[in-house]
Regions:
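Glycan-recognition and catalytic cores of secretory/periplasmic carbohydrate-active enzymes
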Residues: 1-358
């Protein structure tokens, strides 16, 4: 049986000897902007829209790497933050959705999901880099979100202009960002924004004991997709609720619901229905990392086995330090490259393991 101690050693070796060096060398261009993908030979994939959420996630990743003792991470994070600020800030205090490879804006849309990760990256930059720009930018960004994107039905709009369906997911990541800020530089505005997401979770997203994904403008269940439940998000909400100290009973209930209905063959699957029926039996890497992180926080005995299973499947690539993001219900993958966006998920789970004393 794999122990957490052995898992910690395996994670440390993979992260510090392979993944971080690979993505710091090949996953960043000459200007410090992060590529969206590396192919399975470890070469950057050119010509894709470079999404703000990915740039922000990678700033967090390399900040966290530095905090864990990988000193090279500081320089990568600093240049990435510089480019994030230079390329992507709008005049109204919000941030654009995407640029091209040269940093030219190709989508000016302010998207709440992107904005949540900008706030999260700024928190990491304040905590690890001590960057003097980070907190003022976070305060300005949150104020712009409240001013320009607040919905009369609660929470914030998906984007400007508003679009449907509304999703719980961006609000979940807003909570994540606000908790990160409250842990290092508390502010009433951060606390208020966290409360917005927490209240929506309990009074709108939670239906019959599980978090639903898609909604109408007034937070009624979306007619087409309002029944969808993602086990990975049950785990993610469980961890965030536990971190917030807001509702430990709900955190436990969501974790148990995921464990009871959301796994097949040891992995968290993509989608289930209200009765636990499988809607999509495929799986993605991010859901496994959420299961690992939440399982660690609850002291689950099966975490080390899940880590081993992830290494034997998702992380079993010819070039170490890459990953297979997705498998279908028949355990086949059709991925052509490793998305940079997954490294954030891996880092949140693996940093939890590396800091644990179990």
């Amino acid at each position: 049986m794999t122990t957490l101690s052995a898992a910690r050693t395996r994670v440390s070796n993979w992260l510090f000897d392979h993944a971080l060096p690979l993505w710091a060398e090949r996953g960043v261009d000459a200007q410090g902007r992060f590529f969206e993908q590396l192919d399975f030979d470890g070469r950057p994939v050119i010509g894709l829209r470079r999404r703000t959420r990915v740039q922000a996630r990678q700033v967090y990743v390399f900040c966290e790497a530095a905090a864990l003792g990988w000193a090279q991470g500081r320089a990568v994070a600093k240049v990435g933050l510089d480019q994030l600020i230079t390329d992507r800030r709008r005049d109204d205090g919000l941030w654009v959705a995407a640029t091209d490879d040269d940093g030219v804006v190709v989508d000016e849309t302010p998207d709440l999901y992107d904005l949540a990760f900008v706030l999260f990256a700024l928190a990491a930059s304040h905590r690890v880099l001590g960057d003097a720009r980070a907190r003022p930018l976070a305060v300005e960004t949150l104020a712009a979100i409240d001013r320009l994107m607040a919905s009369p039905h609660g929470g914030w709009e998906e984007a400007l202009p508003p679009r449907l369906p509304r999703r719980q997911n961006p609000h979940m990541h807003m909570l994540e960002a606000m908790l990160a800020w409250q842990a290092i530089a508390p502010d009433p505005a951060f606390e208020a924004a966290a409360r917005v997401s927490l209240d929506l979770c309990k009074h709108r997203f939670l239906v019959d004991g599980a978090i639903r994904e898609y909604f109408t403008e007034n937070w009624s269940a979306d007619p087409a997709t309002g029944h969808v439940i993602e086990p990975g998000h049950l785990e993610e909400w469980a961890w965030l609720l536990k971190q917030s100290g807001d509702d430990s009973d709900l955190a436990t209930a969501l974790h148990r619901r995921a464990a009871a209905q959301g796994y097949r063959d040891g992995f968290a699957i993509r989608e289930i229905g209200p009765a636990g029926e499988v809607l999509d039996g495929g799986r993605r890497l991010w859901a496994q990392t959420e299961a690992i992180r939440t399982g660690l926080s609850f002291g689950d005995a099966g975490v080390s086995a899940l880590i081993a299973a992830v290494f034997d499947t998702h992380l079993a690539t010819a070039v170490p330090g890459l990953w297979v993001d997705s498998y279908d219900a028949d355990c086949r993958s059709h991925d052509a490259a490793a998305p940079a966006s997954s490294l954030y998920h891996l880092m949140t789970a693996f940093s939890e393991l590396l800091r644990s004393n179990a």
